[in-house]
């Protein structure tokens, strides 16, 4: 009778301890999600360097003040090569030409695919700077607005560079889910072992 009572009591304790196990399993099955990657930026002039020189034959047609009425066949072939690689490389080519001091008619450059009767649509380059201009437009000097810079505007990069919010936030990490599951199991397990040992000692002393 006493042995059966002891066995029933031990089985009851073991069954109650099994209720804690799913909590640990649920905590362990929820790993931290990886952050979503930022979208890739558009192609730069260095990415388009393999095809950007295909437009060299178009310089005579695209130059500011050019008298040519239509692009040459070699120019159309080069434009088609650039469009097949990446249409945005035309924009990169206009910017690169401006950086080298070559003034091009950006409006005519974007209309060249249509003039060459190509089926690929030209890109939307927006406002082209760095020397690529339309007829009658003069390039804007980058130093023109320098004297109007206020002292507060000059100090703003230093203030943003010393801000701790953007640099220190990524270093904060959330606690591992597995460690919380271990803490949940440790206290009930020790309690069960203590109760079992105490019960066996009590029943053994009572039977003697």
Swiss-Prot record:
Biological role stated in the UniProt entry: Lipid transfer protein involved in seed and ovule maturation and development, probably by regulating the fatty acids homeostasis during suberin and sporopollenin biosynthesis or deposition.
InterPro entries, A to Z: Bifun_inhib/LTP/seed_sf, Bifunc_inhib/LTP/seed_store, LTSS, Plant_nsLTP
GO terms of biological process kind: lipid transport
Membrane topology: Lipid-anchor; GPI-anchor
Sequence segments annotated as region (Disordered): 136-181
Disulphide-bridged cysteine pairs: 48-91, 58-75, 76-116, 89-125
Propeptide: 180-208
Gene3D superfamilies: Plant lipid-transfer and hydrophobic proteins (1.10.110.10)
UniProt signal peptide: 1-25
Phenotype seen when the gene is deleted: Some early aborted shrunken and deformed seeds, with abnormal hair-like outgrowths, and infertile ovules, and increased salt permeability in seeds associated with an increase in unsubstituted fatty acids but a decrease in omega-hydroxy fatty acids in seed coats.
UniProt entry keywords in alphabetical sequence: Cell membrane, Disulfide bond, Glycoprotein, GPI-anchor, Lipoprotein, Membrane, Signal
Membrane found in the keyword field: yes
Organism ancestry: Eukaryota, Viridiplantae, Streptophyta, Embryophyta, Tracheophyta
Glycosylation sites: 27, 67, 105
Localization (cell): Cell membrane
Gene Ontology CC terms, in alphabetical order: plasma membrane; side of membrane
Residues with lipid group (GPI-anchor amidated serine): 179
GO molecular function: lipid binding
Family classification: Belongs to the plant LTP family.
Encoding gene per record: LTPG4
Protein name (Swiss-Prot/TrEMBL): Non-specific lipid transfer protein GPI-anchored 4
Organism domain of life: Eukaryota
Organism annotation: Arabidopsis thaliana
Tissues/organs with expression: Confined to the anthers and stamen of the inflorescence, especially in pollen.
